[in-house]
Amino acid sequence: MTLLRGDDFFTSRAVTVAVEPRTPQTAFPEHYHDFWEIVLVEQGAGVHVFNDQPYALCSGSVFFVRDNDRHLFEDVEGLCLTNMLYRSPRGFRFLSDIAAFLPYGPNGEWQGQWQVNAAGMQQLKQSLNSLAELAQSDAPEAIAASESLFLHILVQLRQQCFQTQSSGSERQGVQALLGWLQNNYSEEVNWGSLADRFSLPLRTLHRQLKQHTGMTPQRYLNRLRLLEARRRLQQSDDSITTIAHACGFSDSNHFSTQFRKAFSQAPKSLRHQAFSREE
């Protein structure tokens, strides 16, 4: 597995933050870093496999990555993102500790996937552009300014993340819906009921989901289900039928057909490959 080193990305060893735009982000094999980063998706689609857990990417996706995390990008389609790099939560010169602004849950668990709305992403992009300029200098005043702006961006992210949980505008409702689908893809979904739940007209729901994900709502839902099914086929001993039902497919034959369409491979073939690698 590839180790990405901070010396290849930070302007100098004195600099504590860096900005790396990827426009586009191509498929990239599994890797890890000796630094921490925050990944902000501006547009496009793809799959982010984070510590063996797949996530479907869309505009507004945000991932917090630690130095001991493994991740990769695959199945990318017009994916554009920006990486905000930092040495570590305690690796700053003028900030003492940023742990309070990182995605730790109430019991200390890491909750590294967030979603922000389009307006919030636009504000963040402006701040990232300014940060990219500051991060080019290792003068003490530039480092202090860059760390201050980095903290400001963290605060922006935290505020925008909470905003997506409220009813607010249509865009905020869609972002909250995307988060709900990511965590509840295995449930039986009635789009009309979901539209009511997130205070969205049904036609708006379809239009906005297509705009954010590049897919129809049902295709996006199937994508989430298939990604989880692929993970379970590779990592568990459960039967194909059990996995299909656990991931929201009521018919295992239909699941196999959809799986072959998505991955050009039958579920049985993938499982055989996974078991062969372990032997």
Curated annotation (Swiss-Prot):
PANTHER family: HTH-TYPE TRANSCRIPTIONAL ACTIVATOR RHAS (PTHR46796:SF13), HTH-TYPE TRANSCRIPTIONAL ACTIVATOR RHAS-RELATED (PTHR46796). SUPFAM superfamilies: Homeodomain-like, Regulatory protein AraC. Residues 192-213, 240-263 bind DNA. Binds DNA as a dimer. Activates expression of the rhaBAD and rhaT operons. The lineage of its organism: Bacteria, Pseudomonadati, Pseudomonadota, Gammaproteobacteria, Enterobacterales. It comes from the Bacteria. Coiled coil: none annotated. One of its GO terms (molecular function) is DNA-binding transcription factor activity. PROSITE patterns: HTH_ARAC_FAMILY_1, HTH_ARAC_FAMILY_2. One of its GO terms (biological process) is positive regulation of DNA-templated transcription. The record marks D251 as: Interaction with sigma-70. It comes from Pectobacterium carotovorum subsp. carotovorum (strain PC1). One of its GO terms (cellular component) is cytoplasm. The gene is rhaS. CDD domains: cupin_RhaR_RhaS-like_N. This is HTH-type transcriptional activator RhaS. It is found in: Cytoplasm. Residues 175-273 form the HTH araC/xylS-type domain. Keywords: Activator, Cytoplasm, DNA-binding, Repeat, Rhamnose metabolism, Transcription, Transcription regulation.
